[in-house]
Amino acid sequence: MQFFRRSMLQVMVSGALCSALPSIAFAQTQKLAPEYDVIVIGSGFAGLAAAISAAENGAKVVVLEKMQVAGGNSSRSGGMMAIPGSSVQKEQGIEDSPAKLAADMKRIGLGLGDPEHIKVVTELAAPTFEWTKKQGVVWRTDLTGKGGHSARRCLITEEGTGQGILIPFMKKLKELGVPVVTGMKVIRLDQNKEGRVIGVTALEDYKFGKEDSGKPVEIKAKDGVILAFGGFSADVGYRTRLDPKLTGNLK
């Protein structure tokens, strides 16, 4: 179960397809405490899932989001998730397995995908799907096989958008007493003399696009900091290591 909780972030990041939708209107201005057990940076699927799991396991948690609203790119997601061997597939008599999805990912990804990450995404997709339902996410039961999928294994939220995941997750965090603080741009991971991360320095009241905005504040983390932010697609060097076709000429 511990491995499942750690790896759930990767599954939530990898499970959705993107479409252009307006950003979800979740703005929170709760007062920060000087210290938490866990600090989560980023309020998309991965960050909110991590925050829920940590809070359910007894941690005092805060989620920091640099934008004025929560949700990140997940708010623009199509709310779709590939789930091999799901309970919905079994009910409809569709044979599928994590191994089949892994083979599809390796084939479409030209063998460039990290084997361990593929293993996490494929083997934990079904339990993660069941976990989202416990958090209040409602999924349609009509299955589809998008793109390179060799089986009908993709499910979409009842709303047909990523908000079908974000809204229940935000409600759950409210129930758990976890603040999601917007307008907080993390600019540094703070470390002790041994190099252990013990907190963050962030710009409070940061306004996206106005780099001179915000006041630096330090927030301590007793147990750790979870990095659940995106944006790697803007890093040409990193993305070309993942796929040589994604050069700086790609617009």
Regions found by a protein language model. Give the residues of each.
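Boundary at the C-terminal end of the N-terminal hydrophobic targeting segment
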Residues: A25-A27
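N-terminal secretory signal peptides and thylakoid transit peptides that target proteins
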Residues: M1-G15
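Conserved beta-strand-loop-beta-strand element in the redox core of flavoprotein oxidoreductases
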Residues: Q191-E218
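Glycine-rich loop(s) and the adjacent beta-strand/alpha-helix scaffold that form part
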Residues: K207-G214, K220-K251
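Aromatic pocket-lining residues of Rossmann-like dinucleotide-binding sites
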Residues: A54
